[in-house]
């Protein structure tokens, strides 16, 4: 390797020598030494390059530690910035802070003017409660609604009568309460009223107009007396008179029992409970009557009106149970062709084995016999003599109405 390089060095030396000669330099011993040194210049340059590279590597090897230190320093700065940003984020805008500061200043001045410590404590507690209450206030629309209601209430209070008028009303209420306290108990008042009502109805059915008029006048006077309600002893006296009058009326001849309605010589009972058609027939038979059989247009109009007023569907004694399409009454009589006009439009239609007739709205309807409905019983009214003795004699025994 050294042998191959020596010719190149020699050639470089010869070339340099020729160039120097061309420039007027003379060849001397020193001159030859300089040429030799220059022949070794490439090697020196290589050594310098290696030296610089080694130094550079050493410096680069030191960079990671400095970079790591710089990074940790940057992290610390970043953390400080983050904390500062969070603290700044909690602050309100400057104007808001100024407003709060001013309010605090005013509050401090006001507190300085407060009375003794106990009073300050009381005010502080009230402020705390007020603050809590304000925090619980609803949204603005709800507040507006409450405000309007308060305004209306204030206006209503403003319309109240003056204090003296209120006092007068209060005294009047007190006197009324005392008067009510002197009345007999409610059950007895109710009993008196019911007996008056029943007596009035019974008197309305009595024969002989002159006798009815006398009793009716007596009842009117008694009713007026009860309406005035004098002291308790007087009320007791009236109650005893009513009891005696009721006993006298019970001995009178009445064409129909209590709770029955008289019409054209017959008595009718309108039930207050419901049964199927067959049980309704039985209920009427048990009181000496029958499920109503209609004999005239007047009777039909009377019964239809009673049913419509009470808004009830009520059984009548009509069915086609024996033969489909052939309607007959419970007394065995067939339905008169002239009565077919009382059927509601489209009836009877026998939808689902509807074999029994009822009062429905303004006419008749056929329905299933096993359905529970109200019912109407009918029987003849009792006859009464116009003779005074007969008039005051006990009436013939009459069955009680069927259980309603």
Curated annotation (Swiss-Prot):
Top-rank taxon: Eukaryota
Keyword presence, Ion transport: no
Residues carrying a glycan: 80
Each Sequence repeat, start to end: 96-118, 119-141, 142-164, 165-187, 188-210, 211-233, 234-257
Motif stretch (Endocytosis signal): 14-15, 16-18, 31-34
Record InterPro entries: C-type_lectin-like, C-type_lectin-like/link_sf, C-type_lectin/snaclec_domain, C-type_lectin_CS, CD209-like_CTLD, CTDL_fold
CDD domains: CLECT_DC-SIGN_like
Span of domain C-type lectin: 263-378
Topology of the protein relative to the lipid bilayer: Single-pass type II membrane protein
GO cellular component, one term: membrane
Cysteine disulfide partners in this protein: 256-267, 284-377, 356-369
Pfam families noted in UniProt: Lectin_C (PF00059)
MF terms in GO: D-mannose binding; metal ion binding
UniProt cross-references to PROSITE patterns, sorted A to Z: C_TYPE_LECTIN_1, C_TYPE_LECTIN_2
Record's signal peptide: none
Main location as per UniProt: membrane
Cytoplasmic topological intervals: 1-37
Self-association and partners: Homotetramer. Interacts with C1QBP; the interaction is indicative for a C1q:C1QBP:CD209 signaling complex. Interacts with ICAM2 and ICAM3 by binding to mannose-like carbohydrates. Interacts (via C-type lectin domain) with CEACAM1 (via Lewis X moieties); this interaction is regulated by the glycosylation pattern of CEACAM1 on cell types and regulates contact between dendritic cells and neutrophils.
Domain notes: The tandem repeat domain, also called neck domain, mediates oligomerization.
Free-text function comment from the UniProt entry: Pathogen-recognition receptor expressed on the surface of immature dendritic cells (DCs) and involved in initiation of primary immune response. Thought to mediate the endocytosis of pathogens which are subsequently degraded in lysosomal compartments. The receptor returns to the cell membrane surface and the pathogen-derived antigens are presented to resting T-cells via MHC class II proteins to initiate the adaptive immune response. Probably recognizes in a calcium-dependent manner high mannose N-linked oligosaccharides in a variety of pathogen antigens.
Protein name: CD209 antigen
Organism name: Nomascus concolor
Gene assigned in the entry: CD209
């Amino acid at each position: 390797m050294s042998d191959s390089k020596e010719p190149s060095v020699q050639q470089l030396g010869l070339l340099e020598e020729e160039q120097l000669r061309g420039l007027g330099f003379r060849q001397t011993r020193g001159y030859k030494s300089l040429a030799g040194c220059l022949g070794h210049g490439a090697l020196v340059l290589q050594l310098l390059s290696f030296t610089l590279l080694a130094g550079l590597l050493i410096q680069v090897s030191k960079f990671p530690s400095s970079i790591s230190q710089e990074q940790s320093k940057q992290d610390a700065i970043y953390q400080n910035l983050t904390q500062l940003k969070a603290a700044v984020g909690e602050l309100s805008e400057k104007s808001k802070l100024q407003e709060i500061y001013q309010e605090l200043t005013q509050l401090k001045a006001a507190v300085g003017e407060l009375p003794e410590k106990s009073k300050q404590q009381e005010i502080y507690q009230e402020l705390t409660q007020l603050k809590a209450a304000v925090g619980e206030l609803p949204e603005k629309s709800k507040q507006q609604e409450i405000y309007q209601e308060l305004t209306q209430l204030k206006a209503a209070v403003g319309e109240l009568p003056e204090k003296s008028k209120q006092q007068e009303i209060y005294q009047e209420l007190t006197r009324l309460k005392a008067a009510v306290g002197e009345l007999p108990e409610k059950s007895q008042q109710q009993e008196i009223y019911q007996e008056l009502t029943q007596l009035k109805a019974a008197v309305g059915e009595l024969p002989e107009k002159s006798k009815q008029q006398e009793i009716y006048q007596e009842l009117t006077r008694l009713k007026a007396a009860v309406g005035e309600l004098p002291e308790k002893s007087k009320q007791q006296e009236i109650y005893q008179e009513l009891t005696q009058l009721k006993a006298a009326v019970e001995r009178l001849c009445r064409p129909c029992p209590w709770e029955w309605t008289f019409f054209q010589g017959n008595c009718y009972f309108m039930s207050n409970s419901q049964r199927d058609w067959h049980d309704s027939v039985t209920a009427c038979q048990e009181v000496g009557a029958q499920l109503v059989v209609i004999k005239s247009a007047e009777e039909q109009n009377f019964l239809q009106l009673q049913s419509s007023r009470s808004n009830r569907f009520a059984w009548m004694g009509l069915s086609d149970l024996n033969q489909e399409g052939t309607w007959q009454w419970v007394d065995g009589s067939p339905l008169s062709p002239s009565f077919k006009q009382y059927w509601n439009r489209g009836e009877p239609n026998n939808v689902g084995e509807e074999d029994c007739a009822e009062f429905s709205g303004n006419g008749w309807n056929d329905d299933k016999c096993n359905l529970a409905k109200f019912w109407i019983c009918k029987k003849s009214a009792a006859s009464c003599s116009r003779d005074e003795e007969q008039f005051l004699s006990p009436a013939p025994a009459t069955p009680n109405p069927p259980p309603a």
